[in-house]
C-alpha cells in the first residue's frame, strides 16, 4: 500500500489494466453462426466469409424475385378488364421456382361471373305459339285454293291432275289423323285440340 502513495510508474499501470482476452477469428465466426441459427464449416479464411455473405444475399434476391413476379402479373392484367384486387393469403404458390414457400403471397381474386345456360329460351307463350302455328296452314290452304280455282278455269289438264293428286293425299292424311293420335301421343299441338269431324269433300271435275 505504501507504493501507491508515491509516483506511479508505467509498469505499475500495466499491472492494473484489466485482462482482455483477444478473440480468435474462428470464435467470432462460431458466434455469428449460432446467432443466425445455421451451421457452416468454421474453416478460417476469406472464402468462408464470402460464402456466408453470398448465402444471405441469395435469400434477399429470392424475396425480390417473388415481389417482382407478382407485380409483373398485376401489370399484365391491368387494362384488360380483370379485377386486380390484391388479397393476402397465407398459402404457398407454385408460380415461380425461386419463390420461397413460407410467407404471405398476394393472389389475384377474380370476380365470379354468373354462368349463363346455353339452352334456348322461349320468348313467346305457348298460347301465342299455337295460334301462330295454326294460322300458317289456313293461309297456305287459302292460297292453294285460289291457285287451284284459277288452274281449273284455264283448263290445263296436267295442272288439274297434279292438284287432284295433292288433294287426295291431303284427304288421306286427314283420315289417318285419329290413328296417328293413338300411335304418337306426345304431340301437344294435336292433343290440345279436339279432332273435328271430317266433312266429305266433293270430287273435283276433271274436265
UniProtKB/Swiss-Prot annotation:
Subcellular location: Virion
Spans through the membrane: none
GO cellular component: virion component
One Pfam match: Corona_I
Keywords (A to Z) from UniProt: Virion
Main localization category: virion
Entry function: Structural protein that is not essential for the viral replication either in tissue culture or in its natural host.
Remarks, miscellaneous: The gene encoding this protein is included within the N gene (alternative ORF).
Protein name: Protein I
Amino acid at each position: 500500500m505504501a507504493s501507491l502513495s508515491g509516483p506511479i510508474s508505467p509498469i505499475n499501470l500495466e499491472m492494473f489494466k484489466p485482462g482482455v482476452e483477444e478473440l480468435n477469428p474462428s470464435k467470432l465466426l462460431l458466434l455469428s453462426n449460432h446467432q443466425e441459427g445455421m451451421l457452416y464449416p468454421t474453416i478460417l479464411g476469406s472464402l468462408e466469409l464470402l460464402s456466408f455473405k453470398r448465402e444471405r444475399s441469395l435469400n434477399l434476391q429470392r424475396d425480390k424475385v417473388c415481389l417482382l413476379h407478382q407485380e409483373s402479373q398485376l401489370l399484365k392484367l391491368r387494362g384488360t378488364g380483370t379485377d386486380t384486387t390484391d388479397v393476402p393469403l397465407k398459402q404457398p404458390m407454385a408460380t415461380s421456382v425461386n419463390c420461397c414457400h413460407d410467407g404471405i403471397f398476394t393472389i389475384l381474386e377474380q370476380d365470379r361471373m354468373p354462368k349463363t345456360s346455353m339452352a334456348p329460351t322461349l320468348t313467346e307463350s305457348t298460347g301465342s305459339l299455337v295460334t301462330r302455328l295454326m294460322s300458317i296452314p289456313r293461309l297456305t290452304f287459302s292460297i292453294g285454293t285460289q291457285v287451284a280455282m284459277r288452274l281449273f278455269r284455264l283448263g290445263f289438264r296436267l295442272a288439274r291432275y297434279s292438284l287432284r293428286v295433292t288433294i287426295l293425299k291431303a284427304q288421306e292424311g286427314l283420315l289417318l289423323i285419329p290413328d296417328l293420335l293413338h300411335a304418337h301421343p306426345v304431340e301437344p299441338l294435336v292433343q290440345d285440340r279436339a279432332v273435328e269431324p271430317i266433312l266429305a269433300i266433293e270430287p273435283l271435275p276433271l274436265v
